[in-house]
């Protein structure tokens, strides 16, 4: 017997019961994006490797350790996308969408990073991101955060996420702070773990989000990033905080909050949760005003965020399971008798025409009434339509409420109206 081929470690199958949950959550996210005027953009999964090296930074963990990179038959270096922003910017430049224009875009799809699989973090993961180009004020930063807050309300998880904010200033201000931070860390190398010692010279701001408690204690005495902000960044951040205060969105200023990718400047933010065990990030983003020019376009202000859907699905399942408890079908059509199958399929097609939003499944494969009602229960149907030879003969159908057990015979011509009343 041939050996079974299984999925690659960290790259998962999502089975029908799971995809129904994903579809409901994704539908909610997309509806909110549409209500703010954001448009979908669809991007390739594979890009040229230099795109990510230039955008993310050659000395980041993503580029150094986590990218799936390969050489194609032409000898070109290609990479499975580890994140979505770089590809979105590349597409905007390539198709002339950005210069002197305002764009609000969103994308969704799989991303790939070779890291240790764990709960909510996989080597193939799914991400939804939104990017805004051409607007530089704090008001659009605030809108993105308000949009995400609306998501949490729609999903029923607002009480389980909290917002952390920071400003990491201009590139020049960050360079000055970087020098001060490195000078401080050099004086305390005995406290640093090996990972922090490596980052101290390659990407020192990442030391700020070290999970090592000894390093975190040391950082209490480190120079504060806020003390190195330029005046424009300080004013921008104050404006953002004022808008969030007016909108009633609670937040914490976390001066150690930095993003793991090099292209960020000024605003950075994260929505975090403690409802999945240890604290985890649900959604994160910020401003990246220099990235478009860095990738070959003309200077264009930009801000955006990305969210890992695996972690979001886990959170909704954990704290609001009622949100995802939707049946596979609303109505199950039970048919028995030699002459009923054709009539049942004709009735089902007519009901799908008259009730396009309703999920209706017709029994196939035979079986007596008991077996067919068991199938209706398996698929979570609220209502069964029962069609036997006598109903076919007199043009009726029996409508049975599977929750209350009540049933009534209804003329087939008026059954759609009756079903709408039952389904609400």
Swiss-Prot record:
GO cellular component terms listed in the entry, alphabetical order: cytoplasm
Gene3D superfamilies in alphabetical order: Anticodon-binding domain (3.40.50.800), Bira Bifunctional Protein, Domain 2 (3.30.930.10)
Source organism, top-level taxon: Bacteria
Keyword annotations of the record: Aminoacyl-tRNA synthetase, ATP-binding, Cytoplasm, Ligase, Nucleotide-binding, Protein biosynthesis
Quaternary structure (record): Homodimer.
Family, similarity comment: Belongs to the class-II aminoacyl-tRNA synthetase family.
Protein name: Histidine--tRNA ligase
Gene for this chain: hisS
């Amino acid at each position: 017997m041939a050996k079974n081929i299984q999925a690659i470690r960290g790259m998962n199958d999502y089975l029908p019961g799971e995809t129904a949950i994903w579809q409901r959550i994704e539908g909610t996210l997309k509806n909110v994006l549409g209500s703010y005027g954001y448009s979908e953009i669809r991007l390739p999964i594979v890009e040229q490797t230099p795109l990510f090296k230039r955008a993310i930074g050659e000395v980041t963990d993503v580029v150094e350790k986590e990218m799936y990179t390969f050489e194609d038959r032409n000898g070109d270096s290609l990479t499975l996308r580890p994140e979505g922003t770089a590809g979105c910017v590349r597409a905007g430049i390539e198709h002339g969408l950005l210069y002197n224009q305002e764009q609000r875009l969103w994308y969704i799809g799989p991303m790939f990073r070779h890291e240790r699989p764990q709960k909510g973090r996989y080597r193939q993961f799914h991400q939804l991101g939104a990017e805004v180009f051409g607007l530089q004020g704090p008001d659009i930063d605030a809108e993105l955060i308000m949009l995400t807050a609306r998501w949490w309300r729609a999903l029923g998880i607002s009480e389980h996420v909290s917002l952390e904010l920071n400003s990491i200033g201009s590139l020049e201000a960050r360079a000055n702070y970087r020098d001060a931070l490195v000078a401080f860390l050099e004086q305390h190398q005995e406290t640093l773990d090996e990972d922090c010692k490596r980052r101290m010279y390659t990407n020192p701001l990442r030391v700020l989000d070290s999970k090592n408690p000894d390093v975190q204690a040391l950082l209490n005495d480190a120079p504060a990033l806020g003390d190195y902000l330029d005046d424009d960044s300080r004013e921008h951040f104050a404006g953002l905080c004022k808008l969030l205060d007016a909108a009633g969105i609670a937040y914490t200023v976390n001066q150690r909050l930095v993003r793991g990718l090099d292209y960020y400047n000024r605003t950075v933010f994260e929505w975090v949760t403690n409802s999945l065990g240890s604290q985890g990030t649900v959604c994160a983003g910020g401003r990246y005003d220099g990235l478009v020019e860095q990738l070959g376009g003309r200077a264009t202000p930009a801000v955006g965020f990305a969210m890992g859907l695996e972690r979001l699905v886990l959170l909704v399942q954990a704290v609001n399971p009622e949100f995802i408890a939707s049946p596979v079908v609303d109505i199950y059509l039970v048919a028995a008798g030699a002459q009923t199958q054709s009539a049942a399929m004709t009735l089902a097609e007519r009901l799908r025409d008259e009730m396009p939003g309703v999920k209706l499944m017709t029994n196939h494969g035979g079986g007596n009434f008991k077996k067919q009602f068991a199938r209706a229960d398996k698929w979570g149907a609220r209502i069964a339509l029962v069609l036997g030879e006598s109903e076919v003969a007199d043009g009726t159908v029996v409508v049975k409420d599977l929750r209350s057990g009540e049933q009534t015979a209804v003329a087939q011509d008026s059954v759609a109206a009756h079903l709408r009343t039952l389904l609400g």
